[in-house]
Amino acid sequence: MRRAGLIKPLLRINNEKQRVWRKNYATQVVSGLEECSLDPKEYVDFKRQLRQLNLPHKDGHTCLQLECRLCDRNRQPVTNAQKGTDHGLLAYVNKRTGAFICPNCDVKTSLTSALLSYQLPKPVGYKQPLQRQPVYESRFPHLAVVTPEACAALGIKGLKEDQLNAIGAQWEPQQQLLHFKLRNAAQVEVGEKVLYLGDRREEIFQSSSSSGLLIHGAMNKTKAVLVSNLIDFIVLATQNIETHCVVCLPYELKTLPQECLPALERFKELIFWLHYDASHSWDAARAFALKLDERRCLLIRPTETEPAPHLALRRRLNLRHILAKATPVQHKAITTFGAMRNDILSELQNIEKVNGVKWKRFPVLNKLLKGHRRGELTILTGPTGSGKTTFMSEYSLDLAMQGVNTLWGSFEIRNTRLAATLLRQYVGYPLDDRLHEFNHWAAEFERLPLYFMTFHGQQPLKPVLEAIEHASYVHDVMHVIIDNLQFMMGVSTFRGDKFFEQDSIIAAFRSFATKHNVHVTLVMHPRKERQEDELTTSSVFGTAKATQEADNVLIIQDKRLTSVRGKKYLQIAKNRYSGDLGIMPLEFDKDGLSYSTQIQNAKRKREKTPSEN
């Protein structure tokens, strides 16, 4: 199977498509694992090898569990007391990516490399992967037991300091924060998560190669409640819920690294009870459920009577009754209004979040499209040279700055040029004459959740779909941009009608957007029209299927070359969500490569202020 790669913006471009680089977030996980798509044949061969060696293994919800042959501890005899109880002796193989992870010896390698260690005799030239005992050094050396004053500062009614100490909380008096340890599936400490009592801000610190979870509850429990922040974790963990463990996600609703999945394998039921504090996080539970196996996942939709745990406690609602009302994420083929009633009420009470992420640079789009929503298909078209890529760069940058994980597939221009355009739009002016500022802005820009496919030029559909499916699973990508669709035609084994081929490609992206709940934006060229004629939905190249499948159709109209007073504007020609159609004027700022009137007005204000003084 051909593996697809992603690059780290502005820092490294890898031309070998088999490599994948994970972006380094501020306060987000930095994975040392070489991530790749799993070849099903490798996985089948690996399981066959285990059967031939009579090695016990178990197919879990997301991982294959087996004895680690790379771990030094496993070369020593295992006592009867350890059998079946010591999770540190287990290794995990992710069934989607093929990542081989041992949380005990911190070995992370590909399935191909791990397969060699299970072969007898060992192949010639075989080298044992480097093992290192995960050791995490805390950034907070002055930790103490929680004091009554610290407990009172949380503002949770009825909470005692003894309860906080019992769930593993520690107090850092100098910075006025509560501290919790994060552990992996082997119960090894790999990081820490802290809550500043002053502004209720949370921060996470992890070791460079691991990612852990905060779990409270007995090891024999098979049900768990997943929450997104420490306040909700404290509320539920101190309520003595006998049937469920309480799990705090490490990165709130931004991403769920695959290194966290082994620690959740033992649970047969997972209930998402999340606090949705931003529009882009509204569908996070469904996205995480796809990664964790939908069949074991349930969901508590936020309503006035079923809010987040800390809000429910403040309103004196019965937490156990709310927990009992959790509904399956995966619905049956046929349902009733009664089954959907709570979902509908939740959407009506949270309509702004349901509308999607609002653009800050393009307020007109907010009025017409209402927001950027996951699971939709958008088509952007316009004449050659009209600025489709430049506009889409700023359009996607606006969303990425608000936490929308974005994957760019630029087949027309190289990633270095695209990344340079995005950086210039981010800064607002060119950096070629201010090179001393580059490191500062590059470091700021690198914090954005942006990923790039390393494909360039014509590409067949299969490896591109493999790449975006991998990105949606590993990096929790919410927005995929393909620029442009015509570069994916004419290179497949299909030798039929080109319009039928394009329809097949569009159908594949439509299916992907719906199945994986990811917004897909396709940049397409229009068919050749007379310059004086306006483009319409029927001007999109190919058959009518493209615009029929799309939820949104955006057309850049450029009349500057055909009329003295001609203008350039973006036309919303189709809007399936709200039905509102209209236009947005496009005025281009060359310095910042920006079409945003907000940015341009701010720039004029800055230029005007010194002259007035």
Swiss-Prot record:
Question: Which Gene Ontology terms of cellular component type are present?
Answer: mitochondrial chromosome; mitochondrial inner membrane; mitochondrial nucleoid; mitochondrion
Top EC class for this record: isomerase
Q: What is the effect of changing residue 260 to A?
A: Does not affect ion and sulfide binding
Q: Which GO terms describe its biological process?
A: mitochondrial DNA replication; mitochondrial genome maintenance
User: Where do the annotations place ATP binding?
Assistant: 382-389
Report the EC code(s) recorded for this entry: 5.6.2.3
Targeting presequence: 1-25
Mutation effect (residue 232 to A) = Partial increase in mitochondrial DNA copy number
Q: What ranges does the record give for the region N-terminal primase-like domain (NTD), renumbered to this chain? A: 24-333
State its cofactor: [2Fe-2S] cluster
Q: Which UniProt keywords apply?
A: ATP-binding, Helicase, Hydrolase, Iron, Iron-sulfur, Isomerase, Lipid-binding, Membrane, Metal-binding, Mitochondrion, Mitochondrion inner membrane, Mitochondrion nucleoid, Nucleotide-binding, Transit peptide
Q: How does it sit in the membrane?
A: Peripheral membrane protein
**Ligand binding ([2Fe-2S] cluster):** 68, 71, 102, 105
Mutation: residue 193 to A; reported impact is:
Partial increase in mitochondrial DNA copy number
Outcome, altering residue 301 to Q? Reduces mitochondrial DNA copy number
Q: What is the effect of changing residue 334 to T?
A: Loss of mitochondrial transcription
Role: Mitochondrial helicase involved in mtDNA replication. Might have a role in mtDNA repair. Has DNA strand separation activity needed to form a processive replication fork for leading strand synthesis which is catalyzed by the formation of a replisome complex with POLG and mtSDB. Preferentially unwinds DNA substrates with pre-existing 5'-and 3'- single-stranded tails but is also active on a 5'- flap substrate. Can dissociate the invading strand of immobile or mobile D-loop DNA structures irrespective of the single strand polarity of the third strand.
This protein is called what? Mitochondrial DNA helicase
What organism, scientifically named, is this protein from?
Drosophila melanogaster (Fruit fly)
Q: What is the lineage of its organism?
A: Eukaryota, Metazoa, Ecdysozoa, Arthropoda, Hexapoda
* The encoding gene: mtDNA-helicase
